[in-house]
Amino acid sequence: MPRPGRNTYSDQKPPYSYISLTAMAIQGSQEKMLPLSEIYKFIMDRFPYYRENTQRWQNSLRHNLSFNDCFIKIPRRPDQPGKGSFWALHPRCGDMFENGSFLRRRKRFKVMKSDHLAPSKASDAAQYLQQQAKLRLSALAASGTHLPPMSTYNLGVSPTSSFKHPFAIENIIAREYKMPGGLAFSTMQPMPAAYPLHNQLTTVGGSIGTGWPHMYSSSMLDSTTPISMANSDYSVSAYGVPIKPICHGAQTLLPAIPVPIKPTAALPALPTHIPAILSNSSPSMSPTSPQTATSQSSPATPSDTLTNPSTALLSVAVH
């Protein structure tokens, strides 16, 4: 089918698609690329039909430019006047039209992802952006203006702040904790183990006496009286709480785990002959003995305590 002449269309709609009209305008230019305004001008000058209802067909033409791979967008150089980018034909779409006729198109041109021109296109765009950045920097240097500081850009660097959260580790460590008796936590002498030595018990006793005067009497914390830990199952922790180990026996290889127990009331100092008396009176202290039941049910009066010292000792042992 021969191509119709230019003067045969007059006011009728030409039989060309928007892709054909755009390709015709680009190939007819000297530089083989045109801005969008020049493409509009070429079509309206060549075909009078498109001089009316310009907004409708121009929207359709822009849609074809953006969604067809046969057209590529070229940014305008800084030295070129005007605004907007240029549009050109893809180098590999030369045979898109059969026999050079814009009336018959072979098939829709599609650029594959593995196209070898894609890396060069990306590199050209990067080079163009670098050139624009250099031009802007030179313009700023010539005008004497300064660039904004780097902190304004979102580079992940936050300025240092002097504000510290009240629950920060520095604030927690810096706090001065007070004990119930008014003794500061920092003045307490920590013990190296759950079982203190003989020379350490006096220091612990002094701290306990100042921390809990209502729980321990002065006679129990007498530093002159030696305290033997050989036959005792109880110990004193660093905070003055009596503890008892879970593991018993001298042959235990595992370290003893201190278990806090409930502190008892203040007791007077016991004489040295009490263990002998308690060992002799062990049958009377049996839970099944009627004497024990009688002593627990009827407390001794102050007169009985003064006249019968063994009753007082028995009540202390039962307690």
Curated annotation (Swiss-Prot):
Residues 278-310 are annotated as: Disordered. One of its GO terms (biological process) is mammillary body development. Its main location: nucleus. PROSITE patterns: FORK_HEAD_1, FORK_HEAD_2, FORK_HEAD_3. Residues 279-305 have a biased composition (Low complexity). It is found in: Nucleus. Pfam families: Forkhead. Induction: By FGF signaling. One of its GO terms (molecular function) is DNA binding. Residues 13-107 bind DNA. It comes from the Eukaryota. In early gastrulae, expressed in the inner layer of the posterior dorsal ectoderm and in non-involuted mesoderm. By the mid-gastrula stage, expressed solely in the posterior ectoderm. At the end of gastrulation, expressed in ectodermal regions fated to become diencephalon, midbrain and hindbrain, and weakly expressed in regions fated to become spinal cord and tailbud. At the neurula stage, expressed in the midbrain and posterior forebrain (diencephalon) but not in the more anterior forebrain (telencephalon). Also expressed posteriorly in rhombomere 5. Keywords: Developmental protein, Differentiation, DNA-binding, Neurogenesis, Nucleus, Transcription, Transcription regulation. One of its GO terms (cellular component) is nucleus. CDD domains: FH_FOXB2. Probable transcription factor. May be involved in the early anteroposterior patterning of the neuroectoderm. This is Forkhead box protein B1. It comes from Xenopus laevis. The gene is foxb1.
